[in-house]
């Protein structure tokens, strides 16, 4: 996950941040080739795709000692992951960009509007994305507190999880 995060930051620093408007998305996708696609936040998508594996590993680690906490964490992480993946905007914007490029001038404003709707409801702006953040980061914070009460994880690991995921959890609300 750290590698995905570092790659995402590197892409942002080298190529620019993810586009903010539908017109910018369409321009970047149509004109910037691979660089345009890289700016669509696929690193975050890949990172979130790894969360179910972490959820299963945490469940396995705690299913004997704290079965209810393990199951709750598993459910929170899986629900959050599902919501986040279902609301990532990259594939929708790629599709709309292709339609926009082929559309007559009269139809292009409709496709720009459709693109703005996708942005407004994506994993960074929409209700499902908000809930995904609460479920995923809340699940990680919760299991980090559980780690404090077990001997299988060091206190440093638990506190690191609380701090890192706690900050990300707060980010959901800010």
Model-derived features: where do they sit?
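Hydrophobic, aromatic-enriched alpha-helical segments typical of multi-pass transmembrane helices
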Residues: 1-174
């Amino acid at each position: 996950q750290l590698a995905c995060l570092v790659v995402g930051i590197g892409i942002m620093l080298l190529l620019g941040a993810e586009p903010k408007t539908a017109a910018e998305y369409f321009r970047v996708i149509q004109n910037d080739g691979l660089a345009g696609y890289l700016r669509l936040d696929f690193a975050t998508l890949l990172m979130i795709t790894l969360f179910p594996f972490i959820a299963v590993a945490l469940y396995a680690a705690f299913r004997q000692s704290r079965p209810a906490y393990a199951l709750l964490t598993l459910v929170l992480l899986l629900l959050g992951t599902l919501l986040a993946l279902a609301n990532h905007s990259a594939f929708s914007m790629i599709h709309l960009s292709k339609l926009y490029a082929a559309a007559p001038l009269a139809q292009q404003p409709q496709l720009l509007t459709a693109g703005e709707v996708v942005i407004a409801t994506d994993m960074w702006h929409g209700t499902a994305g908000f809930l995904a953040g609460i479920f995923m980061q809340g699940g990680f914070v919760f299991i980090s507190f559980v780690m404090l009460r077990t001997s299988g994880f060091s206190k440093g690991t638990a506190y690191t999880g609380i701090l890192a995921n706690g900050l990300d959890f707060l980010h959901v609300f800010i």
